[in-house]
Amino acid sequence: MLEALKPDDYLPLVKAALAEDIGSGDATTLALVPGDSFAMAVMVARDPLVMAGVDLALAAFQEVDERVEFGIEIFDGQLGGLGQALLRVQGPTRALLTAERTALNFVQRLAGVATLTARFVEQVAGTGAEILDTRKTTPGWRALEKY
């Protein structure tokens, strides 16, 4: 496992992901959601998992609107159960809707890697075998997938 992720490790990727997802703007949200609307959302685990990607998810929301506030229920490396709240965000509704897909994608991908790795480690426990990382990572994601 690497040391804690630093913003320089992930902010360029978060910005690129948002630019790719939003493109020239979130036309649906702008058309349907009043600009003065505020909301709260909860990210919930669909399966048991090892949490990963919290900082990236929060960065996605903050990049869209700095007024978004959050509460972390499960931190990176902690176990989350089926139906358990992982994090909560509140702020301008437009910002939450614009960033939510990017935030979810980061958590789903990184928690998936962490959860599968934990299963491998559990399977070889007591055998003397050791699970090692690889250089074969998704381009641009090396620091994240090895974290």
Regions found by a protein language model. Name each.
Residues 1-147:
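Acidic/glycine-rich phosphate/pyrophosphate-binding loops and surrounding catalytic core
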